[in-house]
Curated annotation (Swiss-Prot):
<dbReference type="GO" id="GO:0005179">
    <property type="term" value="F:hormone activity"/>
</dbReference>
<feature type="modified residue" description="Cysteine amide">
    <location>
        <position position="60"/>
    </location>
</feature>
<feature type="signal peptide">
    <location>
        <begin position="1"/>
        <end position="23"/>
    </location>
</feature>
<dbReference type="GO" id="GO:0005615">
    <property type="term" value="C:extracellular space"/>
</dbReference>
<keyword id="KW-0964">Secreted</keyword>
<feature type="compositionally biased region" description="Basic and acidic residues">
    <location>
        <begin position="141"/>
        <end position="155"/>
    </location>
</feature>
<keyword id="KW-0732">Signal</keyword>
<dbReference type="InterPro" id="IPR024276">
    <property type="entry name" value="CCAP"/>
</dbReference>
<dbReference type="Pfam" id="PF11105">
    <property type="entry name" value="CCAP"/>
</dbReference>
<feature type="propeptide">
    <location>
        <begin position="24"/>
        <end position="49"/>
    </location>
</feature>
<feature type="disulfide bond">
    <location>
        <begin position="54"/>
        <end position="60"/>
    </location>
</feature>
<dbReference type="GO" id="GO:0010460">
    <property type="term" value="P:positive regulation of heart rate"/>
</dbReference>
<feature type="region of interest" description="Disordered">
    <location>
        <begin position="135"/>
        <end position="155"/>
    </location>
</feature>
<dbReference type="GO" id="GO:0007218">
    <property type="term" value="P:neuropeptide signaling pathway"/>
</dbReference>
<feature type="propeptide">
    <location>
        <begin position="64"/>
        <end position="155"/>
    </location>
</feature>
<protein>
    <recommendedName>
        <fullName>Cardioactive peptide</fullName>
    </recommendedName>
</protein>
<dbReference type="GO" id="GO:0071855">
    <property type="term" value="F:neuropeptide receptor binding"/>
</dbReference>
Length: 155
């Protein structure tokens, strides 16, 4: 009789604990819906804000599928068709370029650029040749080692 009484008391205590925990969970859930009463409501921002859509073509905030401005080439094409060519402006620009190229300072810079380009090409060719020679030496050395191994194996 005592064992059955102990078992029933333990079951009753377990049931009381389960009911209390269920009540506390319900109270927390009810408070969870009311964020103003939550103790961390001022500390943590509970609302998740989506980041704007970003890509390389349009930037951030809009997608490519949205209608946008016409391509730049259409604007340029229309401007060229509407405006007649100004030959005077074009000829002035060309004459300025010719005058600039005739100056000695520009000629000196052009010569320096060309000489640096030639030096760069010479360095590239020299490095290629050095690479070829090193590869050739490695191949010859590998062939000698292979021959020595074959001679050792044949003896």
């Amino acid at each position: 009789m005592r064992t059955s009484m102990r078992i029933s008391l333990r079951l009753l205590a377990l049931l009381a604990c389960a009911i209390c925990s269920q009540a506390s969970l319900e109270r927390e859930n009810n408070e969870g819906t009311n964020m103003a009463n939550h103790k961390l409501s001022g500390v943590i921002q509970w609302k998740y804000e989506k980041r704007p859509f970003c890509n390389a073509f349009t930037g951030c905030g809009r997608k490519r599928t949205y209608p946008s401005y016409p391509p730049f080439s259409l604007f340029k094409r229309n401007e060229v068709e509407e405006k007649p060519y100004n030959n005077e402006y074009l000829s002035e620009g060309l004459s300025d370029l010719i005058d600039i190229n005739a100056e000695p300072a520009v000629e000196n810079v052009q010569k320096q650029i060309m000489s640096q380009a030639k030096i760069f090409e010479a360095i590239k060719e020299a490095s290629k040749e050095i690479f070829r020679q090193k590869n050739k030496q490695k191949m010859l050395q590998n062939e000698k080692e292979m021959q020595q191994l074959e001679e050792r194996e044949s003896k």
